[in-house]
Swiss-Prot record:
InterPro entries: Actin (IPR004000), ATPase_NBD (IPR043129). GO terms for cellular component: cytoplasm; Ino80 complex. GO terms for biological process: regulation of DNA-templated transcription. Residues 100-196, 273-325 form a coiled coil. Residues 267-298, 313-343 are annotated as: Disordered. Transmembrane segments: none annotated. Residues 270-298 have a biased composition (Basic and acidic residues). It holds the Pfam family Actin. This is Actin-related protein 5. It comes from the Eukaryota. Keywords: Coiled coil, Nucleus.
Length: 575
């Protein structure tokens, strides 16, 4: 400190020892001859009358730590408002709202159990908050204007749709007129002339033209909004869809023969699919009937069978999914030793796929093309698929069966949860709540007395020291064994410093000191007249006295003796 004052600030002289014992200056101003408990903003000192340095104690906890502890607690409690909880604001809150509890644990129990009393002791700090703008309901004029704009836009769309419909009707009428005129020409023409007319028109036969006329007529009626009574009958007619199937081959040209083969293939495929669909529907109806009979006969057994079937199918589907994710490594004969040929790494399904691809690539137009006459012919595309596996044939069937069984179980057991639905269920998006003034209100309850408590329990902030009440007893033990002197000192304890202004400080300090004093021993604590500036006024009075010159250390003395002249007291700062 002396080096800082002389070297940096260039002061001419400083008090010999008084700047080390600032609380002593309160006595100079107040004319006391007492023990001093300085609860100032930085540290706390304990002195007895004239300085008895062997009995001095010092704590590292003061008003600064209370303010910083309060700021940290509020910042952790309200992290979104940490920018508003500045050190200066925490200092202001400490001076206005903090107090020292006479019994710390009892005060905590009040906030734990007694809600009404705790609410009375709680203080609130309202941060600046601007309410969101309230949307005013539109006026009648605004509603009328929007309705007019909406009606205008709707009318414009209706006009556009009507114009488009009129254009389509005109095109259909023109097409229908052309087709009817073409049919009139074919009715009165000979065979060679009819063939030439068909070649120019792009149609293959009169049946195809009739089918086109029927479709155009239906489209025209639909565009005009008229009913189509014979639409279903026309759609059901195989002659209209496949006009060349019933025509003899002798009367067809080579191009028409190719088209006839395509129509036969499509017709056969469609009929096969319809038969398979009807067969599956009949089997499904029969199975549903049998299951319903079993359910009515023994519902518990039926439900148990459904659960077992569901578990089996679920495991099978999960296993297939894991195999696909692992690249199908669980299928086929895989050799992990390396150095084998391509054929040795293929399983049976992959070899069959390669054979089909090779056959399709080199078998071009050999013999009569009868592909598609049987339903089984179309399974070749599934076998040729790259994703095909030896277990993939029933994959879709298993998943559909699994969904069906899960639906039946849910009908009988509402508490059942389908695994697929549980996995596919997407989490709900977080709901955004509008912030209110309550969200910008900071509550200060336990913090009011918890922060000043660190003066008596420094361990709360990690400082391994005794509290100021215990330090008084330690200071007394360091004095002489004369009990009369101790009793006289305990009757005039001066409490000074900024922290002594905290409400409840004097009663709590007195209660703590009594615990270390004999029963019914006299004890009196006095707060300084002005704890904040009494020390400064005492220093000013001492500096103005004639004795001040004998207690100063000048710059010349500093340069001659150095700062070691100050190191002559053995004060124990820690306990």
């Amino acid at each position: 400190m002396s080096e800082l004052l002389f070297e940096t600030y260039g002061v001419p002289s400083i008090g010999n020892d008084t700047y080390l014992f600032v609380p002593l200056l309160s006595i100079v101003h107040g004319s006391f001859e007492v023990r001093i408990v300085d609860a100032k903003d930085v540290s706390s000192y304990f002195l007895k009358g004239e300085p008895v340095l062997g009995a001095c104690c010092r704590t590292n906890v003061g008003g600064f730590h209370i303010t910083d502890f309060l700021r940290q607690l509020l910042s952790l409690k309200y992290p979104y408002h940490s920018a508003s909880i500045t050190w200066e604001k925490a200092e202001e809150l400490k001076k206005e709202h903090c107090y020292v509890a006479l019994d710390y644990m009892s005060e905590l129990q009040i906030f734990k159990n007694n809600k009404e009393e705790a609410e009375e002791k709680t203080r609130y700090w309202q941060l600046p908050w601007v309410p969101p703008p309230v949307e005013e309901p539109p006026s009648e004029e605004e509603l009328a204007r929007k309705a007019a704009l909406k009606e205008k836009a709707g009318q414009r769309l209706r006009d556009m749709a009507a114009a488009k419909r009129s254009q389509k009707i005109a095109e259909l009428e023109k097409q229908l007129s052309y087709l009817e005129e073409l049919m009139e020409q074919l009715d009165g023409a000979e065979e060679e002339e009819a063939t030439a007319i068909l070649g120019r028109s792009g149609y293959l036969s009169q049946q195809e033209i009739k089918s086109a006329i029927l479709k155009a007529t239906q489209s025209l009626r639909k565009a005009k909004g008229e009913s189509n009574g014979n639409e279903e009958k026309a759609d059901a007619s195989g002659v209209d869809k496949y006009p060349l199937v019933s025509v003899p081959d002798e009367t067809l040209t080579p191009e028409q023969l190719k088209e006839k083969k395509k129509q036969i293939l499509l017709k056969t495929t469609t009929e096969g699919r319809m038969r398979a669909k009807q067969r599956r529907a009949e089997e499904e109806a029969l199975r549903e009937k049998q299951e319903e009979e079993r359910r009515l006969e023994n519902p518990e057994l039926y439900l148990e069978e459904l659960r077992a079937r569901y578990s089996e199918l679920s495991d099978r589907v999960d296993q297939r999914k894991r195999q696909k994710l692992n690249g199908g490594k669980t299928n086929g004969n895989h050799n992990s030793s390396g150095g084998v040929g391509r054929g040795e790494r293929l399983n049976a399904a992959q070899k069959e796929r390669m054979r089909l691809l090779t056959s399709a690539a080199f078998d071009r137009g050999k013999g009569e093309d009868t592909f598609g006459t049987r339903d089984e012919d179309w399974l070749v595309y599934k076998k040729m698929s790259k994703d095909n596996d030896d277990d993939d044939d029933g994959n879709d069937d298993d998943e559909s069966e699994l969904a069906r069984i899960a639906s039946k179980i849910q009908d009988m057991d509402p508490t059942f949860v389908n695994k697929a639905e549980a996995v596919q269920q997407t989490p709900e998006p977080p709901k955004v709540r509008t912030l209110t003034a309550e969200d910008y209100r900071i509550s200060i309850g336990i913090e009011r007395f918890r922060c000043p408590e660190i003066l008596f329990q420094p361990g709360m902030i990690g400082i391994d020291q005794a509290g100021i009440d215990e330090m008084v007893s330690i200071s007394l033990r360091r004095l002489m064994e004369d009990e009369a002197v101790k009793e006289r000192l305990c009757q005039s304890i001066l409490v000074t410093g900024g922290c002594s202004l905290i409400p409840g400080m004097i009663p709590r300090l007195e209660s703590g000191i009594r615990q270390f004093r004999p029963y019914l021993s006299p004890l009196k604590l006095v707060r300084a007249a002005d704890p904040l500036i009494d020390a400064w006024r005492g220093a000013a009075a001492f500096a103005a006295s004639s004795k001040f010159g004998r207690h100063t250390f000048s710059l010349a003395d500093y340069r001659e003796h150095g700062e070691n002249l100050f190191h002559r007291y053995n004060i124990v700062y820690s306990l």
